Amino acid sequence: EIPGPLLEESLRQAGWEVIIIDHHRYDELDRRNPLSSLEQFLVIFQITPADLDNLGFDPRIIFGLGVMDRGFVWGLSPAGFSISESAQVRVEYRRRKNLLKGENAILIQSVKRAWETREQQDGVYIIRSDNKEHHIREEISFLLAESHELPPPAIIYEGDGRVTVQDCAQAPLLFAHFGGYTFGNELCWGREANSHPTLTPEQLLVLINA
């Protein structure tokens, strides 16, 4: 996802082969890919299930992590993962992200506060965090997944000013109007912290419900 087109071209001019692994769309750069970054990595380096097994990894878990990177929890079942396999992948995902309960007490408390004050407007969750040091989006996503059979749309405000709209078919429309970036198979949109004045839920809902 880095270092960016200018430096990438400089590297090419210097004789380096540059291979980009990314799956996002940014303001002035479209790097969408149906495969997640992990899945692309496995393909580019021709890493097989046997290779993963020899390296001490569970291939099924690794493939599941790749699916979660592009489709989160909701992508596992369509990709053929059983309920028990999905549970294993989720635990491993959170372990590697340092999200398991007790490993980051400050984050857990922030998520709890945000979750308790959640509200819904026009069928869309609105969730706000007061933590300027840690982002809560992924943990909130796990809570939404535990309480819903299908992914509900949500607007998540981070304490540092970042805003994310996820599980929303209008993510490309939000991108067209407000810039930022898309991810999650074009079902999620976000804008970096403090890059622009904070968008209100009302401003976002106009497009989400368009």
Language-model-derived ranges and their functions:
Residues E1-L35:
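Glycine/small-residue-rich interface belts in oligomeric ring/scaffold proteins
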Residues P3-L6, R25-D27, F72-W74, N131-I136:
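Short acidic, S/G/P-rich loop/turn micro-motifs used as interaction or catalytic elements
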Residues E9, Q13, V43, F63-V67, ...:
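Charged/polar, solvent-exposed surface patches and flexible loops
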Residues L11-I19, Q46-D53, K112-A210:
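Gly/His-enriched, cation/cofactor- and phosphate-binding structural elements
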Residues H23-R94:
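Short alpha-helices
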Residues R60-G64, Q88, I106, E139, ...:
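Exposed alpha-helical structural elements
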Residues L76-S141:
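Active-site rim beta-loop-alpha module in soluble metabolic enzymes
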